[in-house]
């Protein structure tokens, strides 16, 4: 799946703050599994999930790529198109979450699916959380998990 297709799929999930992101997280889990990358889904509240994945060697250190999956509501906003359908106009992407922050998630997923994991000297950690837009609720719930790593 190329970046544009991946981003389009991520934008299509209506992961509005305080609603479930379960379908999106299972999509990401399935996407990573196709590259033989394991991940854990950590259930929070109201059907919302955090996702954690360690890619590469099982050792301390490495780099953490973290992003949130929720978007702010679209009610009361004037959109000229469906905000949950990616529009590409002259290589500019429009859709709810393109800037904050589903493009980052798409880039991260696209890149880790292409790297030669056996060449990594340190791990890459992925953490995708929920409800950042309303107080960083999801990341607060995953901090105790991170401390155990």
What does each of the following model-derived ranges do?
Residues 1-93, 117-120:
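Acidic/His- and Gly-rich active-site-bordering loop/insert found
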Residues 101-149:
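Acidic/histidine-rich catalytic neighborhood of metal-dependent amide-processing enzymes
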Residues 92-100:
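Active-site-proximal loop motif in hydrolases
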Residues 20, 97, 134-135:
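Secondary-structure boundary/capping motif
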């Amino acid at each position: 799946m190329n970046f544009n297709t991946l981003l389009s799929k991520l934008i299509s999930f209506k992961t509005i703050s305080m609603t479930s992101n379960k379908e999106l997280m299972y999509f990401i889990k399935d996407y990573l599994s196709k590259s033989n990358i394991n991940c854990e889904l950590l259930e929070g509240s109201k059907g919302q999930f955090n996702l954690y994945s360690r890619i590469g060697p099982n050792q301390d250190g490495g780099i953490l790529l973290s992003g949130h999956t929720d978007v702010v509501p679209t009610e009361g906003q004037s959109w000229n198109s469906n905000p949950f359908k990616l529009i590409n106009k002259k290589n500019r992407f429009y859709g709810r979450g393109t800037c904050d922050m589903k493009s980052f998630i798409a880039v991260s997923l696209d890149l880790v699916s292409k790297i030669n994991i056996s060449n990594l000297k340190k791990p890459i950690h992925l953490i995708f959380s929920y409800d950042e837009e309303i107080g960083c609720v999801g990341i607060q719930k995953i901090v105790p998990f991170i401390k155990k790593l």
